[in-house]
Amino acid sequence: MAAILPTFSIKSSSCTYSSSKRSLSSPKAVSLSSSVNGTPKVQSLRLSTSFVCSPNQIIKLKSVSPSRSTQLRRAVGGLEIKMMSVDAGIGVMGTKLGMMSFFEEDGTVVPVTVIGFKEGNIVTQVKTESTDGYNAVQVGYERLRDRKLTMPERGHLNKAGVIPMRHLQEFRLVSVDDFTPSQKLLFEELFKEGDMVDISGTTIGKGFQGGIKRHNFKRGLMTHGSKSHRALGSIGAGTTPGHVYKGKKMPGRMGGTKTKIRKLKIMKIDTDLRVVMIKGAVPGKPGNLLRLAPAKIVGKNIPKN
């Protein structure tokens, strides 16, 4: 006999919830109505106050457990709704130019990445809790021709009174009172030499790779009768469990993923060349888009709890 799943609807005085959107309102308690075989049942559901939502938004949920008090979560592979991380401060976007050696005053040689800035880093939109449900500043980067944009994209930028730009990214902040549309953001005004930054970017794509290159596996013997040189070896037991566990390290596509390198030191800011030198390596190859933001340091700009 096929199982009959209950249907749920969640309503409060300020919002109705559904998974088609990514935000929720923050009532401390709402009522949960469900029906099984046509029999209505009403239960109370307590929600975390970390959820945010604008009025009249609808968020569909596949199923809700009344006992979960901190998060609303769907089944495996579904959407998990939680509070988005807030940046430590406003940042900018840049372009990776390459790497070089930097000599400090005492003669120490430091490997640095040179990051340049194309035309852009202009505020295109300021989002507030009253209008969008959260505080954020949208920044545009890298000018391009009008015909490269769609009409909605062009209208969005024209509304802010800015030039056509290729990339748009948001910096979620606690307060956005100091920012206005069409405001120019300069790296030398936001950061100084010695500051720590978090840099995000897309890693270099390597294509399909084996276990040795992708996961640093050790290869097998090349002599002594060995028939497996670069093979994985055992990937699990036999009849029990009778399948390969999820997450097993195996050959597959390597690289081409978004990553973040934290707490990199700014070694030099050259305003004449419009470049900045960052200690260490950053994701991607020369020409890659990078996102630079103040480093999150617990106890300094991020609360310990």
UniProtKB/Swiss-Prot annotation:
Provide one Gene Ontology biological process annotation: translation
Please give the family membership noted in the entry.
Belongs to the universal ribosomal protein uL3 family.
Q: What does this protein do?
A: Component of the chloroplast ribosome (chloro-ribosome), a dedicated translation machinery responsible for the synthesis of chloroplast genome-encoded proteins, including proteins of the transcription and translation machinery and components of the photosynthetic apparatus.
Q: Which UniProt keywords apply?
A: Chloroplast, Plastid, Ribonucleoprotein, Ribosomal protein, RNA-binding, rRNA-binding, Transit peptide
**Gene Ontology molecular functions:** rRNA binding; structural constituent of ribosome
N-terminal signal peptide: none
> Mind telling me what this protein is named?
Large ribosomal subunit protein uL3c
Q: Where in the cell is it found?
A: Plastid, Chloroplast
